[in-house]
UniProtKB/Swiss-Prot annotation:
Pfam families noted in UniProt: KH_2, Ribosomal_S3_C
Functional summary from the UniProt entry: Binds the lower part of the 30S subunit head. Binds mRNA in the 70S ribosome, positioning it for translation.
Keyword line: Ribonucleoprotein, Ribosomal protein, RNA-binding, rRNA-binding
Gene field: rpsC
Protein name: Small ribosomal subunit protein uS3
Organism: Rhizorhabdus wittichii (strain DSM 6014 / CCUG 31198 / JCM 15750 / NBRC 105917 / EY 4224 / RW1)
Disulfide bonds: none
Complexes and interactors: Part of the 30S ribosomal subunit. Forms a tight complex with proteins S10 and S14.
Domain KH type-2: 39-107
InterPro entries associated with the record: KH_dom, KH_dom-like_a/b, KH_dom_type_2, KH_sf_prok-type, Ribosomal_S3_C_sf, Ribosomal_uS3_bac-typ, Ribosomal_uS3_C, Ribosomal_uS3_CS
GO cellular component: cytosolic small ribosomal subunit
GO aspect biological process, one term: translation
Assigned protein family: Belongs to the universal ribosomal protein uS3 family.
Length: 231
């Protein structure tokens, strides 16, 4: 049942890979896993205005390599790199390994599911009508090259007494096709009436062949190409 399982989990080692890429056994596994959770929580809390999509953690040998994918990298780097150095020192205190921090710019945040979901959540918190927020996000994603997008909002939408679920979709979102490059994310909007949940599926085309690193490779190519999306 493609609609009831996480699209990213279904495609691991097909055209997606894990955000934590390391191997450990015994007592080290639990310790490193807890470190990863603390690192991600600290980054998200320290710089929420940087529009962070994901944090990838790799641990080759005695090194902890952290890659932060963000739409506004300048917020993380700061003036003359002061903020990124401060962040690196803070992360270094959370792990016994040497920390290497890399910032990857997301050139098209309109087709990044995490940023789209967070954008809709922010609009709901500012009391913008949920249908308008969903339609605006869908139109922006299709304009920037998405082949299909679906957004679901659930909760006391518009201050209604009874919670309900509303969704909006345009284009194709083939959840059962494993070669489909489907980006998925969730977000929460904390409104005056309670918490509303937002889910976003974005279909970006098909990836033929076995390529677990396809997502990261395409993102890095977009970063180095120097081509910015039309506004």
């Amino acid at each position: 049942m493609g609609q009831k399982s996480n699209p990213i989990g279904m495609r691991l080692q097909i055209n997606r890979t894990w955000d934590s890429r390391w191997y450990a056994d015994g007592a080290d596994y639990g310790r490193l896993l807890l470190e990863d959770l603390k690192i991600r929580k600290h980054i998200m809390k320290a710089i929420p205005q940087a529009a962070i999509s994901k944090v990838v953690i790799e641990r080759p040998a005695k090194l902890c390599r952290i890659s932060v994918y963000a739409a506004r990298p300048g917020v993380i780097i700061g003036k003359k790199g002061a903020d990124i150095e401060k962040l690196r020192r803070a992360l270094g205190k959370m792990t016994s390994s040497d920390v290497s921090l890399n910032i990857v710019e997301i050139r098209k945040p309109e087709i990044d599911s995490k940023l789209v979901a967070q954008g809709v959540a922010d609009q709901l918190e500012r009391r913008i009508a949920f249908r308008r927020a969903m339609k605006r996000a869908v139109q922006s994603a299709l304009r920037l090259g998405a082949e299909g997008i679906r957004i679901t909002c659930a909760g006391r939408l518009g201050g209604a007494e009874i919670a309900r679920t509303e969704w909006y979709r345009e284009g194709r979102v083939p959840l059962h096709t494993l070669r489909a490059n489907v980006d998925y994310a969730e977000a929460e909007a904390h409104t005056a009436y309670g918490v509303c949940g937002i889910k976003v599926w974005i279909f970006k085309g098909e990836i033929l062949g076995h390529d677990p690193l396809a997502q990261d490779r395409l993102m890095m190519e977009a970063q180095t190409s120097g081509v910015r999306p039309a506004r």
